[in-house]
Every structure is written in structure tokens, then in C-alpha cells.
């Protein structure tokens, strides 16, 4: 049995983790095995790479270094968590995946899309998400939410231009492949966002059973 690979994407403060946990609860109520995970991270080694990526430091990180670290963590994550869970027939709910790399390292950092695509093919092979939920909201709201959480990580310290580019890249990718993406308005009250997730459940279950 093959499981279902669902990724949750969006800029800072979009509520991905909260809504990932909500969706997991709804699926588990139906007796479905759910594997919760995140990127960068998901395994002990990948989490150590995450620390390198997120921690502010004295030495600026080159954009290509950042990109390669992202895919190094992803390779470990795919081998250690994602592929085994899918082979068990689980629904994998992943907070960020390769769309985030296109958005942050491509849109935000300005790295060529072809470079990201080459690494995507090398690291992932034929693995792609079955469904991607993009939690969209205005940049100023997302940054205010991130600031309210406390100390900002290395990405959260970027300027508004960076995050506008991130947001637009997500929306462009969603528009190019509407069969895979669902865009949700993360600026709405949480109860309304989660009502939108409830409306998506039948489609998700159909994909799992199909």
C-alpha cells in the first residue's frame, strides 16, 4: 500500500504547524496512520543541519551553501522518514518541503530555478507531494506573528522585500499546478482556516483511497 504525501507551505507566521496538527487529528479520528514531520529537519541528523540553517551567526552564509544544506537535510529526511512512512501506507504531513526551497532560496535569495530543479531531481528522484496546502497571508501580518513568538531566527530577520518574493513565488507555483495545490487564506481567524481544512478532507481521503 502506498500512502499520501501532503506538504504544508507558506511564509513566516502562516500557522502551518498548528494546522498540520489539526489535520493530523482529523485523520487519526478516522483510523488513518499519520506521520508528522518538518523541514529542514525530521531526523536527528537533519535537525542538526536545521540548527546550522536557522541560527544567526557571525559568518554570513552563502546562498549556495544554504541551498546545499537544505537538500542535504532533505536527502536524509526522505531516506529516514518520508519514504518508509509512505511505504507503510501512512499519510505524511510535512511542514515545508521543496516548494519552500523554490520560495526562499529561489524567490528570496534569487538563486536560479534550474539549479534548484537539478538538486530536486537528484535528491528526490520521482518523489513529489500528492497535495500541497499553501497558507497565504500578507507579509506584515506574518512578520508580526513571528515577532510575537520571541527571538527571530536567521530567516525571520530578513527584510520585507525578501518575504514579498517568497509569498509571490508560492502563489505563482500554486497557479501553475492547481491540481496539486490548495491555497488557504491564513489571515482569517483560525476557526475559519480549519473549517477550510475540513472541507478539503473528502478530497484528501479520496486521494488516499484512490
UniProtKB/Swiss-Prot annotation:
Q: Which InterPro entries match?
A: P-loop_NTPase, Thymidylate_kin-like_dom, Thymidylate_kinase
Q: What is its EC number?
A: 2.7.4.9
Catalytically driven reaction(s)? dTMP + ATP = dTDP + ADP
Presence of keyword Transferase = yes
Q: What class of enzyme is it?
A: transferase
Residues at which ATP binds: 10-17
Instruction: Kindly state a single biological-process term from the GO annotations of this entry.
Output: dTDP biosynthetic process
| Signal sequence coordinates | none
- One annotated Gene Ontology cellular component of this protein: cytosol
Q: Which Pfam families match?
A: Thymidylate_kin
GO MF annotation terms: ATP binding; dTMP kinase activity
Q: Does the keyword ATP-binding apply?
A: yes
Query: Which keywords does this Swiss-Prot/TrEMBL entry list?
Result: ATP-binding, Kinase, Nucleotide biosynthesis, Nucleotide-binding, Transferase
Q: What does this protein do?
A: Phosphorylation of dTMP to form dTDP in both de novo and salvage pathways of dTTP synthesis.
Tell me which PANTHER family the record gives. Answer: THYMIDYLATE KINASE, UMP-CMP KINASE 2, MITOCHONDRIAL
Q: Which family does it belong to?
A: Belongs to the thymidylate kinase family.
Q: Report what the protein is called.
A: Thymidylate kinase
| Organism encoding this protein | Pseudomonas aeruginosa (strain UCBPP-PA14)
Amino acid at each position: 500500500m502506498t500512502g499520501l504525501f501532503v506538504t504544508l507551505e507558506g511564509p513566516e507566521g502562516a500557522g502551518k504547524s498548528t494546522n498540520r496538527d489539526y489535520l493530523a487529528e482529523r485523520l487519526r479520528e478516522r483510523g488513518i496512520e499519520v506521520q508528522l514531520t518538518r523541514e529542514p529537519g525530521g531526523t536527528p541528523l537533519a535537525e542538526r543541519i536545521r540548527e546550522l540553517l536557522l541560527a544567526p551567526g557571525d559568518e554570513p552564509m552563502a546562498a549556495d551553501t544554504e541551498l546545499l544544506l537544505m537538500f542535504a537535510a532533505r536527502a536524509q529526511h526522505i531516506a529516514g522518514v518520508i519514504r518508509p512512512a509512505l511505504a507503510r501506507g501512512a499519510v505524511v504531513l510535512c511542514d515545508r518541503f521543496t516548494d519552500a526551497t523554490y520560495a526562499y532560496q529561489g524567490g528570496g535569495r534569487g538563486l536560479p530555478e534550474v539549479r534548484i530543479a537539478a538538486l530536486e531531481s537528484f535528491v528526490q528522484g520521482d518523489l513529489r507531494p500528492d497535495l500541497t496546502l499553501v497558507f497565504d497571508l500578507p507579509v506584515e501580518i506574518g512578520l508580526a506573528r513571528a515577532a510575537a513568538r520571541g527571538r527571530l531566527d536567521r530567516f525571520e530577520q530578513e527584510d520585507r522585500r525578501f518575504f514579498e518574493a517568497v509569498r509571490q513565488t508560492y502563489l505563482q507555483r500554486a497557479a501553475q499546478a492547481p491540481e496539486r495545490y490548495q491555497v488557504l487564506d491564513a489571515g482569517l481567524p483560525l476557526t475559519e482556516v480549519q473549517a477550510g481544512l475540513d472541507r478539503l478532507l473528502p478530497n484528501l481521503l479520496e486521494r488516499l483511497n484512490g
